[in-house]
């Protein structure tokens, strides 16, 4: 199970960001592995994504470890259900930025909306890295890489906004992100949760480190 833990720091994002990276061992255990750390430009929190095999252990981390190490003002958790990871096209542009796309939909149409996201034909300058159900403030969360916000908006307007059941789509720029899981583990993790990978023979799982605002181009 994947869980996003949103951490709202008291002492500023920069200090808390560094504290997370310096204390990853204290923020994890045998059942809860930190995968990725990210920060959305418009928000006053950062997000630490975990792979969780025991939800009770994550509860201990959230109520014990995170407060003792990071001293946040508050935390919020979002469970990512049925996550799907996408490989990246080989002919992608180099200067990509990462955006979180949050979709609110009608309950009876969510499966069709989710499948629409999975099976769209994506161009090389707008494509997802993951999609999952979240069922919180939003119903579906996906991360996309693109050359600009305008390009993401244009693509979603043409290909998703008119989908039956879509109520709202919000786009947020991810200005900072870092993979904290070991590279080989993260690659295996993504591949094991990529049921679509056989449809993308021209894609790969290698991502350049030069992507602006999208370090390692993951999640």
Sequence positions of predicted segments:
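A compositional/biophysical signature of low hydrophobicity enriched in polar/charged and small residues
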Residues: 1-219
